[in-house]
Structures are given as structure tokens and as C-alpha cells.
Amino acid sequence: MSGASARDATLLAFDYGEKRIGVAVGNALTRSARALVVIQNLNREHRFKAVGDLLAEWRPDALVVGLPMHPDGTPHDMTQQAKRFGNQLNGRFGLPVTWVDERYSSVEAEAGLRERNVRGRARAEMLDAEAARVILQQYLDQLSDHEHH
């Protein structure tokens, strides 16, 4: 993506996990992202039906997938699964996928929810979507950094 389309794009971001997939929505023009929903990762059919429903509702121009890494930057057990998920999204829905290093997204998400006094079960349920928001915000911030006008 380049030019005007990248700047006014609607984006969906995913924090892929074996049990849950956090989803966030954002806009490249306003550089804003918000936690959207958590998909229960029950099986492939359920996962892609839920994603398909979100894509139909939000009609994003591109997708962002968090890539889990160890703190030193080496691949993690989940790195390959997240990559496979992103490749499947691209193949199934034909939208461009960008991977974002998500090393500290869950830590940031937890801190953000704590700051807003979200507690207990509500915090546990929102954590994955909030992690997706952090991933998407990182991506949007990188877009800003690359646009030196």
C-alpha cells in the first residue's frame, strides 16, 4: 500500500493465540486503534467464519498480524502459527497482511487495562483484543514515523 490509500485505510489487527484471537480496528488517517472483540479459536472453521464476518462488517483495506518473538528477537513457539494464520488470511480473503513484532503487546495491554481500572474477568476477556490494539497502534505509529513531510 502506498500513497493516499495507505493514509486513509481501515485496518484490522489480530493477536493470534491457540485459544483466543484478539481483534482491533483502526484507521490510518486518524492514526487511532481500538480493541474490538476476542474470537474463540475453537477450530479452523469457526476461526475463519468469525474473521469473515468481521471483514464483511468493517471492510478493511489491509490486515495486521502480531508476530510473537522472544525478548531477544528470536522466533517463539507461536511465531510460525501466527505466520500461518496471516498467510491463511491473505490467501482466503485476498487482503494484504503486514506482520508487526508483538514482543511486549500483552504486557502493554495488561498495563493499559490496569490503568483504566478494568478488573478480574472483564480484564481477562478484554486482554487479547487490547493486545491487538497495541499491535495496531505500533503499526500506525510506524506509518507516522515513515511520513516525514
UniProtKB/Swiss-Prot annotation:
One GO location term (cellular component): cytosol
Chief localisation class: cytoplasm
Keyword Cell inner membrane appears in the UniProt entry: no
Subcellular location: Cytoplasm
Broad class of enzyme this protein falls into: hydrolase
GO biological process: rRNA 5'-end processing
Entry superkingdom: Bacteria
Keywords of the record: Cytoplasm, Hydrolase, Nuclease, Ribosome biogenesis
Molecular function GO labels: nuclease activity
Transmembrane segments: none
UniProt EC number: 3.1.-.-
Family from the record: Belongs to the YqgF nuclease family.
Function: Could be a nuclease involved in processing of the 5'-end of pre-16S rRNA.
Protein name per UniProt: Putative pre-16S rRNA nuclease
Organism: Burkholderia lata (strain ATCC 17760 / DSM 23089 / LMG 22485 / NCIMB 9086 / R18194 / 383)
